Amino acid sequence: MHEITLLQGLSLAALVFVLGIDFWLEALFLFRPIIVCTLTGAILGDIQTGLITGGLTELAFAGLTPAGGVQPPNPIMAGLMTTVIAWSTGVDAKTAIGLGLPFSLLMQYVILFFYSAFSLFMTKADKCAKEADTAAFSRLNWTTMLIVASAYAVIAFLCTYLAQGAMQALVKAMPAWLTHGFEVAGGILPAVGFGLLLRVMFKAQYIPYLIAGFLFVCYIQVSNLLPVAVLGAGFAVYEFFNAKSRQQAQPQPVASKNEEEDYSNGI
């Protein structure tokens, strides 16, 4: 087991502060678990653990997308706490995903609370828009955004630094069957996330590629999944150019003029 130092705790809080702004704006998508876990691992001095937890957590959250006011479990806290738990307690990445999910749900409800609370600012925002006061409108947006980012930082610091002793004690006290249950649940979550993604993106014409990838992984001995990813990228590029060439080969529809146009109105 490892101890998180005060400097590491503050660094993680600062990281999550920036990622919270990115999540609120959905600007650079740095809040995705694969990036959050990698950066967290770099701060903790174990990039390999960050990459492993990032890959698993990203798959688990691949199909979870906000829709309107509905918020899925928070990807930032999921990535952060999965890596922190795996590094500080020594459990494997699959178990860490299951243990990190409650922190993700906690942040999900905090974000939903902010969605409701910030409705109080709408009267002020409408007034600024009506008066074309762009400076005040900008300050209002920055105020709400910084409140959310600060909440991210405070919760991250409390969960990673102040609560690490209790977290390690909890992991030690868990019986083997419960730890194995979290490991099984964590192993299933990436499959569930990928299944949710396929519900949106899957098309019947791509079934051969799915079968080819499955056979490649199961029956061809490779040390890692990088060859499969490269093969998938090749298929994607092929489909892109193939679809583009088919689109260019289609004849362009020509508008027929069955009756003489009237230009009496000048148009």
From Swiss-Prot:
Transmembrane regions listed in the UniProt entry: 11-31, 34-54, 67-87, 95-115, 142-162, 178-198, 210-230
Domain PTS EIIC type-4, residue spans: 1-237
Keywords: Cell inner membrane, Cell membrane, Membrane, Phosphotransferase system, Sugar transport, Transmembrane, Transmembrane helix, Transport
Major subcellular site: membrane
Subcellular location per the Swiss-Prot or TrEMBL entry: Cell inner membrane
GO biological process: phosphoenolpyruvate-dependent sugar phosphotransferase system
GO cellular component: plasma membrane
Domain of life: Bacteria
Topological type in the membrane: Multi-pass membrane protein
Signal peptide: none
Ranges in the topological domain labelled Cytoplasmic: 32-33, 88-94, 163-177, 231-267
Topology Periplasmic: residue spans: 1-10, 55-66, 116-141, 199-209
Domain text: The EIIC domain forms the PTS system translocation channel and contains the specific substrate-binding site.
Task of the protein: The phosphoenolpyruvate-dependent sugar phosphotransferase system (PTS), a major carbohydrate active -transport system, catalyzes the phosphorylation of incoming sugar substrates concomitant with their translocation across the cell membrane. This system is involved in N-acetylgalactosamine transport.
PANTHER family: N-ACETYLGALACTOSAMINE PERMEASE II COMPONENT-RELATED, N-ACETYLGALACTOSAMINE PERMEASE IIC COMPONENT 1
Listed name of the protein: N-acetylgalactosamine permease IIC component 1
Species the sequence originates in: Escherichia coli (strain K12)
Gene of this entry: agaC
